Amino acid sequence: MPELPEVETVRLGLQPAMEGFRIDRAMANRCDLRFPFQPDFAARLTGQTITGLGRRAKYLLADLSSGDVLLMHLGMSGSFRVVNGAGDATPGEFHHPRSEDRTHDHVVFEMSSGARVIFNDPRRFGFMKIFARAAIDDEPHLKGLGPEPLGNAFDAAMLARACAGKQTSLKAALLDQRVVAGLGNIYVCEALWRAHLSPKRKASTLADRKGAPTDRAVRLVDAIRAVLGDAIKAGGSSLRDHRQTSGELGYFQHSFAVYDREGERCRTPGCNGTVKRLVQNGRSTFWCSGCQT
């Protein structure tokens, strides 16, 4: 499933074709994806201008001139294709090669920019939903999400407070979207390596006895921000499912220090350890026991 950098790269790729432009026509080519489309889905979108295209955690949010918001989630295999006079491009094609099977083109937006924006999703784990902007605080998919890891609200003090007293592993805590929004398996592994912290360490050790952030919390916040920033600049990680809107693959996977590198030499200078793999909560964790403590 795409993580924050992949979704952000998709957002950046869609902006030139969608933000500030009117949806001249919206079409849903089937009655459902992961969830059924609302009965008035196409009608509520057609004729509306996308006044802003944002992101919250792993969700894309299109603000509409009607006061509604279109929430979009890529799921496991969803991708957007932008077709215009310049050709055919796919923002954020990272994990799976883009499906060439047009029978999986499930949603089409014909924009006043002249572009056709097409959502293709072979597995149909993605979904789209419209809700009123005024009700955003009550939207179930967004309610309870933690702070954005690249936002000002995310700092060592906040992370220490969120993890104080937690006996769960540090890896599990970071994957909890209530603690911090948008992180997934890849970037948690990479951030823990950069911060030299074991994924098995208790989350509570990010706070001291008084609840103040320890040096570990400071290092981890810096590492999370850095790894996400680097991944966005690189266009995400091309492992299985998603390409950029340009159709190009992301390149951050070439910079992986530990993820999917089991048995290889650790890249920390002076460390003679090797990358190990363990399973935590049903997910593979990659780490170096030599320098991550």
Swiss-Prot record:
Domain of life: Bacteria
BP GO annotations: base-excision repair
SUPFAM superfamilies xref list: Glucocorticoid receptor-like (DNA-binding domain) (SSF57716), N-terminal domain of MutM-like DNA repair proteins (SSF81624), S13-like H2TH domain (SSF46946)
Catalysed reaction equations from the record: Hydrolysis of DNA containing ring-opened 7-methylguanine residues, releasing 2,6-diamino-4-hydroxy-5-(N-methyl)formamidopyrimidine; 2'-deoxyribonucleotide-(2'-deoxyribose 5'-phosphate)-2'-deoxyribonucleotide-DNA = a 3'-end 2'-deoxyribonucleotide-(2,3-dehydro-2,3-deoxyribose 5'-phosphate)-DNA + a 5'-end 5'-phospho-2'-deoxyribonucleoside-DNA + H(+)
Gene that this polypeptide is encoded by: mutM
Residue positions binding DNA: H104, R123, K166
Name of this chain's protein: Formamidopyrimidine-DNA glycosylase
Organism in which the protein naturally occurs: Rhodopseudomonas palustris (strain HaA2)
InterPro entries: DNA_glyclase/AP_lyase_DNA-bd, DNA_glyclase_Znf_dom_DNA_BS, Formamido-pyr_DNA_Glyclase, FPG_cat, MutM-like_N-ter, Ribosomal_uS13-like_H2TH, Znf_DNA_glyclase/AP_lyase
Assembly description: Monomer.
